């Protein structure tokens, strides 16, 4: 029986999360997320979303390339940003109460930012790890025909193995993979966190039927 598979547990709450940051450095003191977006889903359908523009107790230093790619506007940020301390309780509530936390390259990037968010508030993020699903890792497993082996590895261990597995010519970035799946989307607006998440959800709803978890 396959009733243990995620696709058959339709009542589970999934939270997709994505952050836009100052640059690509993973050290929290040099790379704060200025946009934190989340989409909550049940049975593959969006039931709620949050799109926070965030400010901190120091000025942001968004790199030129990052600003261009993400269309960061200092004027818009100054007008719309709210203090991190105000948005964190919602982020924590959504992530802590989700059955699964998802993102594309979440284990390779966003989880480091989430770790810093929790630690900034004197909290541990470790309880999130075992329920984290990285669609980039999982699609890599699909493409390389590497299935999860529950008798010898956890789902998290399986994903980290895939995170560090490379194959020449294998494309796993969100845009490339989604186009391969024939997903329609406003690709020109990618690198806005909420737009990325909407695509991530579409990809998840396609690839879930190919997963053995």
Give the ranges of each region predicted by the language model:
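Short alpha-helix plus adjacent loop in nuclease-associated cores
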Residues: 132-165
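Acidic, Mg2+-coordinating catalytic module of metal-dependent nucleases/exonucleases
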Residues: 97-108, 113, 117-118, 155-213
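Proline- and acidic/polar-enriched loop/turn elements at helix boundaries
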Residues: 79, 130, 189-191
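Generic detector of well-ordered alpha-helical packing
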Residues: 19-21, 135, 197
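A short acidic, often aromatic-flanked loop/helix-cap motif at beta-alpha or helix-coil junctions
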Residues: 58-60, 138-141, 193-194
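Conserved non-catalytic scaffold segment of RNase H-like nuclease domains
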Residues: 2-121, 126-128, 168, 174-181
